[in-house]
């Protein structure tokens, strides 16, 4: 995911992803479009322009582009002339799904119809959202959300309460779609932690507390009625 759906409204929006400037906007059908924020004519920022008749219009010379990146209007040459096919915008495939704008960063022919998401959250939930910039590399942020040893120290008054410093396992299952972690921290009374075999048996009786779904969403199951979702945006 790149951003929340509610952030993309009537005006074009500029964002930087992967070290490149992009413009995000909605076409006449309210479909979200992600394109390079640079007019191929003379490099003006399209995010400073407007959306007119379902086309994003350059603020410099009025060149207008559709959701596929094709230049549909070049006012200076007149409406009787078809603009050059070289006037195209880089337009990656995106989806507006479950409150997020998702980017398919690969071959469009291999894209799935819907992005990966948590089935438990598909319906029936009330929620609020916050945005937060973390001054760390994306991989470190994800790694931190799968670490259970820091809980009694960093989150001592919430999910880490009880000073359960002894880490049993944790028991982890993974496949090509996700990583699932069962948190079994205990108070340290000098006992030995349970074996992974014992933890595996215990895991069959409950849901994993932590689930990371590739490439960038994470779910914390706090209780049956309270969950925390994090979307990692590069």
Predicted regions mapped to residue ranges:
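C-terminal catalytic domain of Rieske-type non-heme iron oxygenases
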Residues: 31, 109-234
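Rieske [2Fe-2S] iron-sulfur-binding domain
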Residues: 3-122, 227
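Helix N-cap / beta->alpha transition motif
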Residues: 1-4, 137
């Amino acid at each position: 995911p790149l951003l929340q759906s509610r952030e993309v409204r009537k005006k074009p929006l500029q964002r930087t992803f992967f070290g490149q400037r992009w413009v995000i906007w909605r076409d006449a059908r309210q479909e979200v479009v992600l394109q390079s924020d640079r007019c191929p004519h003379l490099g003006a920022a399209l995010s400073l322009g407007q959306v007119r008749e379902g086309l994003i219009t350059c603020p410099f010379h009025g060149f207008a582009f559709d959701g596929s990146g094709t230049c549909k209007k070049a006012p200076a040459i007149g409406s009787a002339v078809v603009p050059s096919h070289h006037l195209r915008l880089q337009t990656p495939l995106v989806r507006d799904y479950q409150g997020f704008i998702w980017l398919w960063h690969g071959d469009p022919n291999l894209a799935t119809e819907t992005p990966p998401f948590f089935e438990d959250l598909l319906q029936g939930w009330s929620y609020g959202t916050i945005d937060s910039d973390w001054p760390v590399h994306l991989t470190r942020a994800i790694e931190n959300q799968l670490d259970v040893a820091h809980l009694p120290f960093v989150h001592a008054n919430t999910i880490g309460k009880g000073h359960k410093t002894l880490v049993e396992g944790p028991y982890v299952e993974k496949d090509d779609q996700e990583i699932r972690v069962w948190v079994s921290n205990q108070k340290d009374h000098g006992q030995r932690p349970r074996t992974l075999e014992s933890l595996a048996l215990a895991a069959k009786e409950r849901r994993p507390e932590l689930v990371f779904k590739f490439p960038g969403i994470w779910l914390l199951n706090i209780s049956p009625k309270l969950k925390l979702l994090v979307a990692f945006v590069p």
